[in-house]
Regions:
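Auxiliary Fe-S-binding modules of radical SAM enzymes
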Residues: 1-155
């Protein structure tokens, strides 16, 4: 609504303090009833996500490739964060990095000296060339819905 100017007096989004407050209050109010509170690095960026690790957040989500939902909504923070960058960011916040399964069970805890590279760490600078681009994908007519009445395809 903000980006397209559809509604008057709509803010471009929450302030940084709004974001911190929301996560901190969620941690206090939920009182570990929901044990994992995640920061969306795609929406908030790496620096804000790192700060949120000190304000109730204990999960940074994962490495997303060709993510489209946040990108379509205007997120500006990238399509890929390499695992080694995640671990460095977590350590710099004074936390211990761990990898989890989708079910939130811990898969692996990384120690201070772990410098293991993940295959995604080895992807070059041309991330869109390797994985594709959401912005290019949505411009292709190939995947657009065409109502059967207007379609030239034979059914």
């Amino acid at each position: 609504m903000f980006m397209k100017g559809l509604v008057d007096n709509v803010r471009p989004g929450p302030s940084g303090m709004d974001v911190i407050t929301m996560h901190a209050v969620a941690r206090i109010m939920l009182n570990n009833w929901i044990p994992s509170i995640q920061a969306s690095w795609v929406k908030e960026g790496s620096r804000m996500s790192q700060l949120l690790l000190t304000a109730g957040v204990n999960d940074l989500g994962g490495t997303l490739i060709n993510e489209g939902i946040s990108t379509a909504a205007g997120a500006q923070h990238g399509q890929l964060m390499r695992p080694s960058v995640f671990r460095q960011m977590i350590r710099e916040a004074g936390r211990i990095p761990a990898e989890r399964y989708t079910t939130y069970k811990t898969r692996r805890v990384f120690n201070d000296t772990d410098q293991e590279l993940d295959p995604l760490d080895l992807v070059g600078d041309d991330v869109e060339g390797v994985f594709g681009s959401y912005n290019r994908l949505v411009k292709l007519d190939t995947y657009r819905f065409e109502h059967p009445i207007n379609s030239s395809a034979k059914v």
